[in-house]
Amino acid sequence: MLSAANIVPLRLAKQAGVRKVIAHSHNASAPGIVRKLMDGVNRPRMKHYVNEKFACSEKAGRWLFGDKAFERGEVTLVANAIETDKYGFSESNRRKIREKLGISGDALVVGHVGRFQVQKNHEAILRIFHEIQRKEPAARLCLIGDGELKEQIQEQAKKAGVLDKIIFTGVCQDVERYLSAMDVFLFPSLFEGLPFTLLEAQA
Protein backbone atom coordinates (compact mmCIF):
# COMPACT_ATOMS: atom_id res chain seq x y z
CA MET A 1 0.00 0.00 0.00
CA LEU A 2 1.12 3.57 -0.66
CA SER A 3 -1.01 5.36 1.90
CA ALA A 4 -3.60 4.84 4.61
CA ALA A 5 -6.27 5.57 1.98
CA ASN A 6 -5.77 1.94 0.89
CA ILE A 7 -6.94 0.48 4.19
CA VAL A 8 -9.74 -1.70 2.73
CA PRO A 9 -7.43 -4.51 1.46
CA LEU A 10 -5.78 -4.64 4.89
CA ARG A 11 -9.12 -5.00 6.66
CA LEU A 12 -10.31 -7.67 4.23
CA ALA A 13 -7.08 -9.63 4.64
CA LYS A 14 -7.47 -9.58 8.42
CA GLN A 15 -11.11 -10.66 8.18
CA ALA A 16 -10.12 -13.51 5.86
CA GLY A 17 -7.76 -14.86 8.49
CA VAL A 18 -4.51 -13.94 6.76
CA ARG A 19 -1.82 -14.41 9.40
CA LYS A 20 0.70 -11.94 7.99
CA VAL A 21 -0.76 -8.63 6.88
CA ILE A 22 1.93 -6.23 5.68
CA ALA A 23 1.73 -2.50 5.08
CA HIS A 24 4.48 -0.81 3.08
CA SER A 25 5.05 2.93 2.88
CA HIS A 26 6.58 4.09 -0.37
CA ASN A 27 5.83 7.79 -0.05
CA ALA A 28 6.10 10.68 2.40
CA SER A 29 2.89 12.59 1.75
CA ALA A 30 -0.40 12.34 -0.12
CA PRO A 31 -1.75 14.48 -2.97
CA GLY A 32 -5.07 16.27 -2.68
CA ILE A 33 -7.27 17.29 0.24
CA VAL A 34 -9.54 14.23 0.02
CA ARG A 35 -6.55 11.86 0.08
CA LYS A 36 -5.06 13.70 3.06
CA LEU A 37 -8.36 13.47 4.96
CA MET A 38 -8.63 9.75 4.24
CA ASP A 39 -5.08 9.26 5.47
CA GLY A 40 -5.82 11.19 8.65
CA VAL A 41 -8.88 9.07 9.41
CA ASN A 42 -7.47 5.69 8.42
CA ARG A 43 -3.91 5.90 9.76
CA PRO A 44 -4.89 5.31 13.44
CA ARG A 45 -7.17 2.39 12.41
CA MET A 46 -4.49 0.67 10.38
CA LYS A 47 -2.70 -0.74 13.44
CA HIS A 48 -5.66 -3.07 14.07
CA TYR A 49 -5.16 -4.87 10.75
CA VAL A 50 -1.40 -4.94 10.24
CA ASN A 51 1.21 -7.37 11.63
CA GLU A 52 4.25 -6.01 9.83
CA LYS A 53 5.21 -2.48 8.85
CA PHE A 54 7.73 -1.78 6.10
CA ALA A 55 9.00 1.46 4.56
CA CYS A 56 11.48 2.41 1.86
CA SER A 57 12.95 5.23 3.97
CA GLU A 58 12.76 6.70 7.46
CA LYS A 59 10.70 9.65 6.24
CA ALA A 60 8.23 7.35 4.51
CA GLY A 61 8.00 5.16 7.60
CA ARG A 62 7.38 8.03 9.98
CA TRP A 63 4.78 9.54 7.65
CA LEU A 64 2.57 6.46 7.37
CA PHE A 65 3.12 4.71 10.70
CA GLY A 66 3.94 7.63 12.99
CA ASP A 67 6.98 8.65 15.01
CA LYS A 68 6.10 6.46 18.00
CA ALA A 69 5.87 3.27 15.93
CA PHE A 70 9.17 4.14 14.29
CA GLU A 71 10.90 4.87 17.60
CA ARG A 72 9.61 1.60 19.07
CA GLY A 73 11.28 -0.28 16.25
CA GLU A 74 8.03 -1.49 14.73
CA VAL A 75 8.95 -0.32 11.23
CA THR A 76 11.38 -2.29 9.08
CA LEU A 77 13.30 -0.26 6.50
CA VAL A 78 13.84 -1.95 3.15
CA ALA A 79 15.59 0.49 0.86
CA ASN A 80 14.76 0.49 -2.83
CA ALA A 81 17.52 -1.13 -4.88
CA ILE A 82 18.60 -0.98 -8.51
CA GLU A 83 21.05 -2.75 -10.80
CA THR A 84 23.93 -0.29 -10.59
CA ASP A 85 25.78 -1.83 -13.54
CA LYS A 86 22.77 -1.21 -15.76
CA TYR A 87 22.55 2.46 -14.85
CA GLY A 88 26.25 3.31 -14.81
CA PHE A 89 27.53 6.00 -17.16
CA SER A 90 28.16 4.96 -20.77
CA GLU A 91 30.04 7.22 -23.19
CA SER A 92 28.59 5.20 -26.06
CA ASN A 93 25.01 5.73 -24.89
CA ARG A 94 25.71 9.41 -24.32
CA ARG A 95 26.87 9.87 -27.90
CA LYS A 96 24.10 7.77 -29.48
CA ILE A 97 21.24 9.36 -27.57
CA ARG A 98 22.49 12.87 -28.24
CA GLU A 99 22.73 12.06 -31.92
CA LYS A 100 19.22 10.60 -31.85
CA LEU A 101 17.83 13.73 -30.18
CA GLY A 102 19.81 16.13 -32.35
CA ILE A 103 21.85 17.52 -29.46
CA SER A 104 25.46 18.56 -29.95
CA GLY A 105 28.14 16.83 -27.93
CA ASP A 106 29.13 19.95 -26.00
CA ALA A 107 25.62 21.22 -25.17
CA LEU A 108 24.50 21.25 -21.54
CA VAL A 109 21.65 18.75 -21.14
CA VAL A 110 19.32 19.02 -18.17
CA GLY A 111 17.01 16.07 -17.61
CA HIS A 112 14.14 14.68 -15.60
CA VAL A 113 12.34 11.35 -15.50
CA GLY A 114 8.83 11.24 -14.10
CA ARG A 115 5.12 11.26 -14.77
CA PHE A 116 3.60 14.64 -15.57
CA GLN A 117 1.60 15.14 -12.38
CA VAL A 118 1.53 17.70 -9.56
CA GLN A 119 3.82 15.65 -7.30
CA LYS A 120 6.73 15.80 -9.75
CA ASN A 121 6.67 19.61 -9.86
CA HIS A 122 7.44 20.18 -13.54
CA GLU A 123 6.63 23.86 -13.10
CA ALA A 124 9.76 24.23 -10.94
CA ILE A 125 11.77 22.37 -13.58
CA LEU A 126 10.64 24.89 -16.20
CA ARG A 127 11.57 27.84 -13.98
CA ILE A 128 15.02 26.42 -13.28
CA PHE A 129 15.66 25.60 -16.92
CA HIS A 130 14.52 29.06 -17.98
CA GLU A 131 17.24 30.56 -15.77
CA ILE A 132 19.81 28.09 -17.11
CA GLN A 133 18.84 29.01 -20.66
CA ARG A 134 19.65 32.66 -20.03
CA LYS A 135 23.25 31.75 -19.21
CA GLU A 136 23.57 28.73 -21.50
CA PRO A 137 21.57 29.41 -24.70
CA ALA A 138 22.64 26.06 -26.18
CA ALA A 139 21.29 24.13 -23.18
CA ARG A 140 18.54 21.57 -23.73
CA LEU A 141 15.95 20.06 -21.39
CA CYS A 142 15.03 16.40 -21.78
CA LEU A 143 11.77 15.37 -20.11
CA ILE A 144 11.08 11.64 -20.02
CA GLY A 145 7.60 10.46 -19.15
CA ASP A 146 3.93 11.08 -19.84
CA GLY A 147 0.88 12.13 -17.88
CA GLU A 148 -2.20 14.30 -17.56
CA LEU A 149 -0.27 17.57 -17.13
CA LYS A 150 2.01 17.16 -20.13
CA GLU A 151 0.07 19.50 -22.43
CA GLN A 152 -0.18 22.08 -19.66
CA ILE A 153 3.59 22.02 -19.16
CA GLN A 154 4.14 22.30 -22.90
CA GLU A 155 1.91 25.37 -22.99
CA GLN A 156 3.82 26.94 -20.10
CA ALA A 157 7.10 26.21 -21.87
CA LYS A 158 5.74 27.90 -24.98
CA LYS A 159 4.78 31.02 -23.03
CA ALA A 160 8.23 31.09 -21.43
CA GLY A 161 9.84 30.91 -24.87
CA VAL A 162 11.73 27.67 -24.22
CA LEU A 163 9.49 25.07 -25.87
CA ASP A 164 11.89 24.66 -28.80
CA LYS A 165 14.68 23.93 -26.32
CA ILE A 166 12.81 21.06 -24.65
CA ILE A 167 12.62 17.45 -25.79
CA PHE A 168 9.56 15.48 -24.67
CA THR A 169 10.46 11.83 -25.20
CA GLY A 170 7.33 10.23 -23.80
CA VAL A 171 7.69 6.95 -21.91
CA CYS A 172 11.04 5.22 -22.52
CA GLN A 173 11.94 1.60 -21.83
CA ASP A 174 15.66 2.36 -21.95
CA VAL A 175 15.90 5.24 -19.49
CA GLU A 176 19.45 4.29 -18.52
CA ARG A 177 20.69 5.25 -21.99
CA TYR A 178 19.10 8.69 -21.73
CA LEU A 179 20.56 9.29 -18.27
CA SER A 180 24.06 8.98 -19.73
CA ALA A 181 23.22 11.79 -22.16
CA MET A 182 22.38 14.20 -19.33
CA ASP A 183 24.73 16.53 -17.47
CA VAL A 184 22.30 17.68 -14.79
CA PHE A 185 19.37 15.75 -13.32
CA LEU A 186 16.55 17.78 -11.76
CA PHE A 187 14.20 16.17 -9.25
CA PRO A 188 12.18 18.85 -7.38
CA SER A 189 9.29 16.59 -6.33
CA LEU A 190 6.92 18.01 -3.73
CA PHE A 191 7.06 14.69 -1.86
CA GLU A 192 8.66 11.27 -2.29
CA GLY A 193 9.65 8.20 -0.31
CA LEU A 194 12.86 6.88 -1.84
CA PRO A 195 12.35 7.22 -5.61
CA PHE A 196 13.90 4.65 -7.95
CA THR A 197 14.43 7.38 -10.53
CA LEU A 198 16.75 9.33 -8.27
CA LEU A 199 18.75 6.22 -7.41
CA GLU A 200 19.09 5.39 -11.09
CA ALA A 201 20.31 8.90 -11.90
CA GLN A 202 22.99 8.67 -9.21
CA ALA A 203 24.26 5.21 -10.20
Protein language model regions, located:
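Aromatic "clamp/platform" in nucleotide-sugar-dependent glycosyltransferases that forms part
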Residues: 171, 190
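A conserved mid-protein helix/loop that constitutes part of the nucleotide-sugar donor-binding site
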Residues: 108-137, 148-154, 196
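Short glycine/serine-rich donor-binding loops of glycosyltransferases
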Residues: 10, 195-198
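A short helix/loop element that forms part of the nucleotide-sugar donor recognition site in Leloir-type
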Residues: 88-103
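Nucleotide-activated donor-binding/catalytic signature segment of Leloir-type glycosyltransferases, i.e.
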Residues: 154-170
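A short, active-site helix/loop in glycosyltransferases that binds the activated sugar's phosphate group
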Residues: 50-88
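Short His-centered aromatic/hydrophobic patch
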Residues: 1-6, 25
